[in-house]
Amino acid sequence: MKFTRLNDDIAFKLNCGFRVSDAVPSESSYSRLVTQLSESNVLDEVKERLILQAIKEGFITDDTVAIDATHFEARDKAPTKEEKPKAEPKKHGRKSKAEREQWLKEQAEKEANMPLYEKKIGDQLDVSLGELRKEVPIDPKWGVKKNSEGKNEFWFGYKGHLAVGTSSQYILQSFFSSGNLNDGKAAIPLLKGIHERLSLPKLRYQTMDAGYDYEAIYKQVYKMGHQSIIAYNKRNESEIIGFDKHFAPTCFREHSYRYDSYDVKYETLKYTQPKECIDCPLANDGICQKVFKMKITKDLRRYTAPARGSVAWKNIFKRRTAVERVNAYLKEFFQLNNVRYCTGKRTKVHFDIVTLIYNASKLAVDRINTQLITQVA
């Protein structure tokens, strides 16, 4: 770690809060400060206070939050790949009743003793926000992601998970983890953070890509009183007879019913007859219904308001690009991918400072713009 610029560039030194006559602290002083920050929650507390201040001043009035993750490499040296021992060949045939009971018992014990983030996502629903934040793995690990060409890209490092207001583009919640953590396993901590720590009365929608298509995430969003706008990830599911690819009912001739409205009181989607049914000879024979109603609680993954496939659903889903823009800003302008520290604890300090400075910059710009508008008026 070098501080030659602080000594050589007076303007930079003044911008950093030093006077010309001040001595620049030593490298070890900065190292001790980073260590102290890594062992406390002070940066998390400051980030939260800043967001609450932005809400108080009226700069955050979003109705939609977009959630996504971005990866960045560690400064630590990547370990050599360990060869996994060959698994013992499985015995042919069915297990006896006693063997199966013993196997089920062993599996239950194994799952019970797993770390929280190695369990199923649904197990996070009843866990407190404090424990979710405390138990997250933060050591650098190998991560993998498919690129635009469908090929696997590997990196050794971390992931930053963000929940961003789609219109204000403030980072409402951030979450730091090892590079091998499944994106979906960070969604519930982010959602609980928004629900429990922030007051956003206009918030209605949570939008995410197909990597977050897990039933537990839909349940968490539903518990918050919001709607999930999440791309559907078809997992070897057979086609449902009588419904189209967006799970809207179809008529006798397989034309899709049109989404009409949502009844908030009864949590019901209303679908009306397809336009093709106007001239259909079966329309007046009592074979096809004029109206279909579907409760979203029948299947939270498939039914949301507005309904999947509708113009309104697509327009809300487009807002998800806000979090991708913020991820790009953090890497291009705020040094997110220029990690200067080893170990996960110290890198989390880097991540927290980056997200804090981004939000602080947003708040400063919003205040300046408000002053300029007031002066013009």
Which residue stretches match the model-derived regions?
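Polybasic low-complexity intrinsically disordered regions
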Residues: 4-7, 17, 25-223, 227, ...
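Short secondary-structure capping/turn micro-motifs that flank functional sites
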Residues: 70, 237-238, 347
